[in-house]
Amino acid sequence: MTDLFRFVNEGWLATHAIPDDRPIDGTFYQLRDQAELDVYEIVKNSPDSRAGKLFHSFMDTEAIETAGIAPLDPDLQLIDAVTSVDELVTAFVKLCRTGVDVPVGAYVAKDSGSDDAIPYLAQAGLGLPDEAYYREPMHQQTLAAYQQHVGTMLAFLGLDATAAEQVVALEKDIAAGHWDVVSTRDAVKTYNPTALADLPGPVRDLMVGILQGTTDKVIARMPSFLDHVAGLLTADRLDDWKLWAKWHVLRGRAGLLTDEISQANFAFYGTVLTGTPVQRDRWKRGLDLANGYVGQEIGQLFVAKHFPESSKTEMVELVDYLVKAYHERISQLSWMTPATRERALEKLAKFQAKIGYPDKWRDYTGLEFESDGSALVENVRRGSAFLHDYELNKVSKPFDRSEWFSTPQTVNAFYNPTVNDITFPAAILRPPFYSPDADAAENFGAIGAVIGHEIGHGFDDQGSQYDGDGNLHSWWSDEDRAAFTERTAKLVDQFQGLVPTSVREAGIETTGVNGEFTLGENIGDLGGLGIAIVAYRMYLADRGLTLADTPTRPFVAEGGSPELTKHEFSGLQRLFLAWSHVWRSKTRPELDVQLMASDPHSPSEFRCNVIAGNVAELYEAFEVPADAPMFIAPENRVTIW
């Protein structure tokens, strides 16, 4: 074994063409395709539901084309009427409630210092994925294309190229106050309880308007950014801000307007930024819209049709094995002192799992949509206002730990450090991640490792700073934190500067993977795979078996290497092969560049191979030559949990 990722995925990587309407494809996206078809059947057959009406309004292209740019008039007139900074802030308050970006982001979550829900304030205000795009030389070509794109779009509003120059110049100034991606991950630095009255002038006024008297305290995630953007909200920049606001109205609503406007916006955000040649089919984009506003209404029907209760029962058993495996490993850690080990076990004991679907569905009473395409933008305003008010209603009340923040039809998994729970929506609990008919080794190597990954986030470089109740305070001794950091530093070094195949073959300039930025996800992956193996051993032991007792069987994964089809594999080997199959993925190089700048996950090929190379059992399962790219010498392998 020289390359686990390609051993399982080589044929698929060589022959599979990424569909023209997406920048990435693989196992996650194949599951999303299936969930999308399932949701389409639900929405199509429920024309009088909220989802059905919203979907129909998006599909009514004749009315949308007739309406042209006019649906934006209420937003644009609001901005045109602004004559002072105070009026600008008032306009931002109204725009924010109806789904338009404003210079400061705000969301409601559990307070990391109490059990209440509280607003968190974050940096915002950019039209590019990250502040690095405005300052790093390797992104200057993209920045120039962005300015040209802003000009193209603002022409739909009758504005000239000078307006685009003003918008991008202001965004450069906004970006200068943004924290970098590594700093924004720091749980301690980004937790700053602040009195509303102590926020800098214009930001205070903005938040007073948005929060409507629900609280006198917020959490400032990036305090210096709030000071910075407040310093830009001045009378001499008023014209710049009004143009900026018009741009963000148009940018945010472009997909709801005529095909010409929608395609023009996609030409940059789809093609330039991600390399995607064509937009997704309209019905798919319509489903995205419906899922975004009434996803749990759809999810209730999705679960009834596509998620048997037996799958939930079996997943609970799998989670139990993973938790027991973590308990065993933590109990045996030689690098952690007994007192800290005990506190880690206390946190693990408080861990909760949400599987499949919520016990209580969201109530959408009061939200109504119209089916006509001429009402599409207004439908989105209504939906945004409903969700805005829904979140605002939580503030200063005990946080509801049972609430789901995703839909059952979402193909993903989540760990929430402020609640200490994981969420596994129904749509991810399908092959190749999970199947009730699959061999246990394959389920542990796929969904088991993903479960282990999510639990592992509770013990990664940031999650480990929260206790079992989701509160942010140090439960580590200095000695233990130093030992932890020593181990994680090796993982940072292993990933630092790695360049994904797509980018290398395209000859695109890049600094590669940022090992510090991706550390949390890499810790999650490392713990996930290692703990999945421990859990699989426990599963076998409960049945009176060991790894040596597992039968050899073929591993079925269409698109593997020729060698994959020639052999049968032990249980441990199939666990690793299932791990590799999960990470099957191809990405356009433009998207890989964007993700390395803004996404804390490493590229899939490295999540598979570098992580597996650190796990001792890989070398028991396969013969890995010392000169193989994925071989890691024993003294350099990282084991944390």
Label for each model-derived stretch:
Residues 1-28, 130, 421, 426-428, ...:
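His/Glu-rich zincin catalytic helix
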Residues 10-14, 45-48, 64, 101, ...:
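Intrinsically disordered or highly flexible coil/loop and linker segments, enriched in small
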Residues 18, 23-27, 31, 42, ...:
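Gly/Pro-rich cap/lid or specificity-loop segments adjacent to the active site
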Residues 20-43, 161-177, 443-449, 563, ...:
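Short secondary-structure subsegments characteristic of cysteine-rich extracellular domains
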Residues 31, 35-38, 87-98, 316-448, ...:
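Zinc-dependent metallohydrolase catalytic domains
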Residues 43-321:
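Noncatalytic, helix-rich "gating/capping" subdomain that lines the substrate-entry/channel surface
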